[in-house]
């Protein structure tokens, strides 16, 4: 009677192999069994593939998001996240999102001091949500906020559909109308206004310039202090006065000042607070976001469909259960990374023919 054996590993000169099998004839493949050591098997089946780089693709069976706003032409994802005029549109829902912009990423309207805050993370924060929408109402009345009344500042580099000058829809540049004097820290409460139990992402910031401009705009040329607090996270800033080279955004006039932009995440029903002095950019429209979207670094455009998205190889179709090559983050129905090639071998222990007994 032939014995049934489970073959565990094929021994070759160039690969590790996982094997199973049953008794069969002789073959050049040597396997290691759990109980009988090395035996011969046949029928080796490759289990691994080594991918080649390809275009990123839409993930099969899943809505995949490339740009935050596909219909917002000539807009970076940071433009969309800050709601720059002419960059406001519908963000499609998606279970998977491509992080396609490479640092540093700028936004028009006004020169931003990116390194002072986590503002570069804002587009990626939004990508991590399945559903994202911009509120239709402003979260506070900026013109009548504490320390006002204010007029709302604009930039010639921010034209909108009705005016040659505008500003981000997520913030209001609060410039005192008449009371251009120094002020002690003021506090404004930021209510939760999303209506579907979403996370509320509230964008805010402050403007700073050289001493002359600070005096003209705000009546105070000293560094200003700012604090935000929401969801147990508190952030403090002190503005820089002067020392900025002139910078032009999108063909506008050279600007001597800078803005620092940050955001806070408010959970359902929770109020945030902003403590500020002169030059504050008060929050206006907020992002309401829910669900989860898996984020992976990649590139655009998305071409066709794929089983798996891999940071190094792009779109992959799963032809084998394992792969070798570069190990990196992957999402979807992906093969498993292994260090060396694997193969499945089904074969049998070779039994030499019995010797015939000589007749007497």
Swiss-Prot record:
GO terms for biological process: fusion of virus membrane with host endosome membrane; fusion of virus membrane with host plasma membrane; symbiont entry into host cell; virion attachment to host cell. In natural infection, inactive HA is matured into HA1 and HA2 outside the cell by one or more trypsin-like, arginine-specific endoprotease secreted by the bronchial epithelial cells. One identified protease that may be involved in this process is secreted in lungs by club cells. It comes from the Viruses. Keywords: Disulfide bond, Fusion of virus membrane with host endosomal membrane, Fusion of virus membrane with host membrane, Glycoprotein, Hemagglutinin, Host cell membrane, Host membrane, Host-virus interaction, Lipoprotein, Membrane, Palmitate, Signal, Transmembrane, Viral attachment to host cell, Viral envelope protein, Viral penetration into host cytoplasm, Virion, Virus entry into host cell. GO terms for molecular function: host cell surface receptor binding. One of its GO terms (cellular component) is virion membrane. Glycans are attached at residues 40, 74, 160, 179, 210, 246, 317, 346. Residues 1-15 form the signal peptide. It is found in: Virion membrane; Host apical cell membrane. InterPro entries: Capsid_hemagglutn, Hemagglutn_HA1_a/b_dom_sf, Hemagglutn_influenz_A/B. The keyword rRNA processing does not apply. It is a single-pass type I membrane protein. Belongs to the influenza viruses hemagglutinin family. Major glycoprotein, comprises over 80% of the envelope proteins present in virus particle. Binds to sialic acid-containing receptors on the cell surface, bringing about the attachment of the virus particle to the cell. Plays a major role in the determination of host range restriction and virulence. Class I viral fusion protein. Responsible for penetration of the virus into the cell cytoplasm by mediating the fusion of the membrane of the endocytosed virus particle with the endosomal membrane. Low pH in endosomes induce an irreversible conformational change in HA2, releasing the fusion hydrophobic peptide. Several trimers are required to form a competent fusion pore. Homotrimer of disulfide-linked HA1-HA2. This is Hemagglutinin. It comes from Influenza B virus (strain B/New York/3/1990). The gene is HA.
């Amino acid at each position: 009677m032939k014995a049934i054996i489970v073959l565990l590993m094929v021994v070759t000169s160039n690969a590790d192999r996982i094997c199973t099998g049953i008794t069969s004839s002789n073959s050049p493949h040597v396997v290691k069994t759990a109980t009988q050591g090395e035996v011969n098997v046949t029928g080796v089946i490759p289990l691994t593939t080594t991918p080649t780089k390809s275009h990123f693709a839409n993930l099969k069976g899943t809505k995949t998001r490339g740009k935050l706003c596909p219909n917002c032409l000539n807009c970076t994802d940071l433009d969309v996240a800050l709601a720059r005029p002419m960059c406001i549109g519908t963000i499609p829902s998606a279970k998977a999102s491509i992080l396609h912009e490479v640092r540093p990423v700028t936004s028009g309207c006004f020169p931003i001091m990116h390194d002072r805050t986590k503002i570069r993370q804002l587009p990626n924060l939004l990508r991590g949500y399945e559903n994202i929408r911009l509120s239709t109402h402003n979260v506070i009345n900026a013109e009548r906020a504490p320390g006002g009344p204010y007029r709302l500042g604009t930039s010639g580099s921010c034209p909108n559909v009705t005016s040659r000058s505008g500003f981000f829809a997520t913030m209001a540049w609060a410039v005192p109308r008449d009371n251009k004097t120094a002020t002690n820290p003021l506090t404004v409460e930021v209510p939760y206004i999303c209506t579907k139990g979403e996370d509320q992402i509230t964008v805010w910031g402050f403007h700073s310039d050289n001493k002359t401009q600070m005096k003209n705009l705000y009546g105070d040329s000293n560094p200003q202090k700012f604090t935000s607090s929401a969801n147990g996270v508190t952030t403090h800033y002190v503005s820089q006065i002067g020392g900025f080279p002139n910078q032009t955004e999108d063909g506008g006039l050279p600007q001597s000042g800078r803005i620092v932009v940050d955001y806070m995440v408010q959970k359902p029903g929770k109020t945030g607070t902003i403590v500020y002095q002169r030059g504050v950019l008060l929050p206006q429209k907020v992002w309401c976001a829910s669900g989860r979207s898996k984020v992976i670094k990649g590139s655009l455009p998305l071409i066709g469909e794929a089983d798996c998205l891999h940071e190094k190889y792009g779109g992959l179709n799963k032809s084998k259960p394992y792969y070798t090559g570069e190990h990196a983050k992957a999402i979807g129905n992906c093969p498993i990374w292994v260090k060396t090639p694997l193969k499945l071998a089904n074969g049998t222990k070779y039994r030499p023919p019995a010797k015939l007994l000589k007749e007497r």
